[in-house]
C-alpha cells in the first residue's frame, strides 16, 4: 500500500499534498479554514448540480421552478437551503481565512496571496449571479442596481451595461447568461484552488510566529487531518442548525415576492457578505467615485504586501499592530451593519466615517505603526 501511495503518478500527488506534506508543528486552529473552504466549495458544487437539474433560467418560470424544487422535488427544500446558507458559511470562512492571512503575515507569500485575491473576486461574482437566479424582487433589483454601476465607466459605460444585460433592461437574456456563468464559475474557482495550493506547497505554510520552521516540520496526516476534522464537524453542525431551524435567517423576505420591474422594494440591499462593500459604495455621493471605492475595497488586498513595513512578519509580537487589526475588524462589522440600513442620518455619516477609516487604517495607520514598532525594538 505504501509503495502505491508513494510511487503511483496520481497517488503521489495526493500523498505530497495531503498525507506526507511537511507542515509547521505550531499552526493553530486559524489554519483550519483553508480545508473548510474546500469543504464549502464541494458542498456548493454538489447541491448546485442537483438544483440545476430542476431549475429553469426563464423569467416566466424561474421563480416557480424554485418553488417547485422546495415543494415537489424529494428533499429539494433541504438542498436549496443548504446551497443558500452554504454560501453564507463559505464567506464566513473566507473572511476569517483572509483575516488570518493579514494577522500572521501570510501575504508575504505573494503568488499564493494574489491567487487568493483572484479566488475572492471569482467567488463574489459567483455568489452575486447566484442571488439573481431565484428571480424574486431583491434578485431583480439587486441585479439592476449592481450591473448599472458599470454605466459609471466613462465613454463605454452605457454600451457595456446594455451588453451585459443583453438588452435595454435586466430581462430573460440577463437571467440566462447569469445562470450559465453561475454554473461554470465554481469549476473555475476549483481550478484556481488547485493553483493556490500548488503555490502554497512551493513555499510551505506560514505559522503563528512568522519565522521559518524548516527544522521542525511534522506530517500533515494524521496530525492536521484530524485537527481539520474537528473544524469540519463544527462547520457541518452550524450549517445543519441554520438550515433546519432558521433557513431564512440570512435571506431577505422581499425575495419571496416574484420579480416585478414596476415595483421598487423600499430598500435594495445585497446579501450580508457584500454589505461592507455596498456601504463603501453608498458613502460616496459621486457615482464613479463610489464604483472606484467599491473596487478598491477589495483590490486594496493586493497592496498589503507592498505596504508591509514591519521587520517581523507576524503580528503575534506586535501589540500596537494587533490593536489596529481589531479596529479594522470592528470597522468592517460597522460597515456591514450600515450597508443594511436605509440611506438617512445618522447612518450616512457613520458609513462615510467608517469608509474613510477603512482605507486610512490599511494605507496609512498600519504601515506607520509598523515603522514605530521597529523603532521601539531598535531595528
Swiss-Prot record:
Membrane topology annotation: Multi-pass membrane protein
A Pfam family it matches: Cytochrom_B_C
Parts of the chain that traverse the membrane: 33-53, 77-98, 113-133, 178-198, 226-246, 288-308, 320-340, 347-367
Binding residues annotated for heme b b566, in chain numbering: 97, 196
Gene Ontology MF, one: ubiquinol-cytochrome-c reductase activity
Cofactor(s) for this UniProt protein: heme b
Entries under SUPFAM superfamilies matching the protein: a domain/subunit of cytochrome bc1 complex (Ubiquinol-cytochrome c reductase), Transmembrane di-heme cytochromes
GO cellular component terms, A-Z: mitochondrial inner membrane; respiratory chain complex III
PROSITE patterns named in the record: CYTB_CTER (PS51003), CYTB_NTER (PS51002)
Cofactor annotation remark: Binds 2 heme b groups non-covalently.
Main location: mitochondrion
Source organism, top-level taxon: Eukaryota
Keyword Lyase among record annotations: no
Residues annotated for heme b b562 binding in this entry: 83, 182
Gene3D superfamilies referenced in this protein's UniProt entry, alphabetically: Cytochrome Bc1 Complex, Chain C
Additional remarks: Heme 1 (or BL or b562) is low-potential and absorbs at about 562 nm, and heme 2 (or BH or b566) is high-potential and absorbs at about 566 nm.
Function in brief: Component of the ubiquinol-cytochrome c reductase complex (complex III or cytochrome b-c1 complex) that is part of the mitochondrial respiratory chain. The b-c1 complex mediates electron transfer from ubiquinol to cytochrome c. Contributes to the generation of a proton gradient across the mitochondrial membrane that is then used for ATP synthesis.
Protein name: Cytochrome b
Protein species of origin: Nycticebus bengalensis
Gene label: MT-CYB
Amino acid at each position: 500500500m505504501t509503495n502505491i501511495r508513494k510511487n503511483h503518478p496520481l497517488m503521489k500527488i495526493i500523498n505530497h499534498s495531503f498525507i506526507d506534506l511537511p507542515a509547521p508543528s505550531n499552526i493553530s486552529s486559524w489554519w483550519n479554514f483553508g480545508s473548510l473552504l474546500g469543504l464549502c466549495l464541494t458542498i456548493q458544487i454538489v447541491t448546485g448540480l442537483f438544483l440545476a437539474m430542476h431549475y429553469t433560467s426563464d423569467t416566466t418560470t424561474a421563480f416557480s421552478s424554485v418553488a417547485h424544487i422546495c415543494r415537489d422535488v424529494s428533499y429539494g427544500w433541504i438542498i436549496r437551503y443548504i446551497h443558500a446558507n452554504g454560501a453564507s458559511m463559505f464567506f464566513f470562512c473566507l473572511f476569517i481565512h483572509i483575516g488570518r492571512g493579514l494577522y500572521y503575515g501570510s501575504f508575504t507569500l505573494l503568488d499564493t496571496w494574489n491567487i487568493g485575491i483572484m479566488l475572492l473576486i471569482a467567488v463574489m461574482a459567483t455568489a452575486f449571479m447566484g442571488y439573481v437566479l431565484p428571480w424574486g424582487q431583491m434578485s431583480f433589483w439587486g441585479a439592476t442596481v449592481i450591473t448599472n454601476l458599470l454605466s459609471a465607466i466613462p465613454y463605454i459605460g452605457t454600451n457595456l451595461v446594455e451588453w451585459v444585460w443583453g438588452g435595454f433592461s435586466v430581462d430573460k437574456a440577463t437571467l440566462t447568461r447569469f445562470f450559465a456563468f453561475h454554473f461554470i464559475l465554481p469549476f473555475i474557482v476549483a481550478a484556481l484552488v488547485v493553483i493556490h495550493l500548488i503555490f502554497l506547497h512551493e513555499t510551505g505554510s506560514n505559522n503563528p510566529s512568522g519565522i521559518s520552521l524548516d527544522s521542525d516540520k511534522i506530517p500533515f496526516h494524521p496530525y492536521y487531518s484530524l485537527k481539520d476534522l474537528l473544524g469540519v464537524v463544527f462547520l457541518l453542525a452550524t450549517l445543519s442548525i441554520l438550515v433546519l431551524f432558521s433557513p431564512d435567517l440570512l435571506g431577505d423576505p422581499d425575495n419571496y415576492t416574484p420579480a416585478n420591474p414596476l415595483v421598487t422594494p423600499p430598500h435594495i440591499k445585497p446579501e450580508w457578505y457584500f454589505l461592507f462593500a455596498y456601504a463603501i459604495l453608498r458613502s460616496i455621493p459621486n457615482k464613479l467615485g463610489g464604483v472606484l471605492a467599491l473596487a478598491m475595497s477589495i483590490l486594496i488586498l493586493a497592496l498589503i504586501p507592498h505596504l508591509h513595513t514591519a521587520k517581523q512578519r507576524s503580528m503575534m509580537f506586535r501589540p500596537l499592530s494587533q490593536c489596529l487589526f481589531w479596529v479594522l475588524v470592528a470597522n468592517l462589522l460597522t460597515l456591514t451593519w450600515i450597508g443594511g440600513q436605509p440611506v438617512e442620518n445618522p447612518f450616512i455619516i457613520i458609513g462615510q466615517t467608517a469608509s474613510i477609516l477603512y482605507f486610512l487604517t490599511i494605507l496609512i495607520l498600519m504601515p506607520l505603526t509598523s515603522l514605530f514598532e521597529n523603532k521601539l525594538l531598535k531595528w
